[in-house]
Amino acid sequence: MIKPRGENQIQYLHNILTHDISFGIGPAGTGKTFLAVAAAVEALERQEIRRILLTRPAVEAGEKLGFLPGDLGQKIEPYLRPLYDALFEMLGFERVQKLMERNVIEIAPLAYMRGRTLNDSFIILDESQNTTVEQMKMFLTRIGFNSKAVITGDVTQIDLPRSTKSGLRHAMEVLSKVSELSFNYFESKDIVRHPVVAKVVQAYEEWEAQDEIRRQETAAQRRAEREQKVRSENETNLGE
């Protein structure tokens, strides 16, 4: 069994085991996807579920996978590589291949899940910050009886067009008070990769926070200038 590190990972794994739907939100390297896969593998080993389903939005391909060469697995394999890596580390390459041949482990692009009901399954939606609101709702309503779902993502790494709201951000707002769901948040201090990764993430977080302050100050200054201009024009008009 994979052992969690740190309080946030311990709580996250506990929530996965005690909730049917759990969200793991935070930067890369915090173990949110790895622990979800570990929980799925353990549930399969204990015969608590019949299959593991891995999915993520293929934003880079616009989910137009029909234009890519190969069968379905080959088309979306590059987008699911982090999940494969976790599975291979836990079960070994050959066993994963055999389980996939029997559809015990299934991979599917998010766009292909519409219309399905997933019973007796452990479903992991990775990179969920790149889902649209409609895709997130569709995914959450696919979950059937005796199934668990873990949704992982990083709201600082959204690849959607600026005009498109992230389904993960929307879910965080809409579902935060649903007690049957768990929301688990990770920070740069929770990163369990090379120590320099945590420092890199922290540096970016600090820069982004300062950049947001700068943008707000610039916007406030522009508003003040516009208001001053309007007042000056009004005073000029009154003088005439």
Where are these regions (language model features)?
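Conserved helicase motor core of SF1/SF2 NTP-dependent helicases
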Residues: 3-125, 129-240
